[in-house]
Amino acid sequence: MSSSSDPITAAVAGASGYAGGEVCRLLHAHPNISLRTVCASSSVGDPLSAHQPHLHGIGEYVLAPTDATTLSGHDVVFLALPHGHSAELAARLPEQTLVLDLAADHRLSSSESWERWYGGSHVAPWPYGLPELAGARAKLTGARRIAVPGCYPTAAIL
């Protein structure tokens, strides 16, 4: 991780989609974060502005391949990929990298629930990134892998 005086380096996988674009917008505006890499498998080589024309100041970024080689070397990686695509990629990222998964791949603790709602194989759950839940803050402390809650559960829980 960067020293306290250096900005935190960030990468966003799935930057061409809605959630990835919002993450890019928020990171670009953050004074202590340097957005270094944006990825989108189906749009490699496109400027970010081709998919996110509203993102002024970072539209010239070129979309890179969504793979572990491209994403490694950043302090934090945001995975804004379709459900079922984050788990394999996250498993190939260095353990010291903070990874936040916006998909459902690591949200559910029950294999039965995962298979019912999403299909496919279930992977191990990560701490749920909603510190307002009882006991969640302690699980998040020091975690290097975090499952970002979706909008519906967040609204229902809060």
What does each of the following model-derived ranges do?
Residues 1-158:
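N-terminal Rossmann-like NAD(P) cofactor-binding subdomain of oxidoreductases
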